[in-house]
Amino acid sequence: MAASRRVVVTGMGIISPLGNELETTWQNILAGKSGAKTVTAFDVTEYPTKFAAPVENFDDVNHLDVKTKRRVDEFVQYGLVASKHAIENSGLELNSIDSSRIGVSIGSGIGGLDTIEKNALTLNKRGPRKISPFFVPGAIAVSYTHLTLPTIRLV
């Protein structure tokens, strides 16, 4: 049997329809607010559901470089920024901690659909050579763990 280990959550970060940082999101939850809104980004006349819960006012300026933004789907960018917020929220000096004792836990329902759709259209119109080699890693949820760990010097 493996030795039991304690897990301590030291920092949290969130990008959500209720806010793009922890305190705002928490206050909106306590206030009973909903992140759902009528869809205005496209015509929903033919759709049975006319609402969604989009992330709004996402500010990545101080968190992501241009190359990362170009290579990964916006939902992966949410995960990267939320991870950075969690690290900041922890208050830990990461350079002074054994990296084998640090982990990042990330949750997401679904994402990358914009990137998948754009690449499917590109494939059909222009052929496979026009698909970016960053298509799959830029569209899947595990991308943010892969991209976050070097940022916080864990690998």
Q: What do the PLM-derived regions correspond to, one by one?
A:
Residues 145-151:
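Conserved small/polar residues in nucleotide/adenosyl-binding loops
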Residues 14-23, 66-81, 128-140:
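Active-site pocket-shaping loop/turn-to-helix segments
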Residues 6-8, 102-103, 134:
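Structural motif
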Residues 1-68:
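ACP-dependent fatty acid/polyketide chain-elongation machinery
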Residues 85-131:
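Hydrophobic alpha-helical hairpins/lids featuring a short glycine-rich hinge
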Residues 2-4, 8, 72-85:
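N-terminal amphipathic, basic-rich helices that act as targeting or association modules
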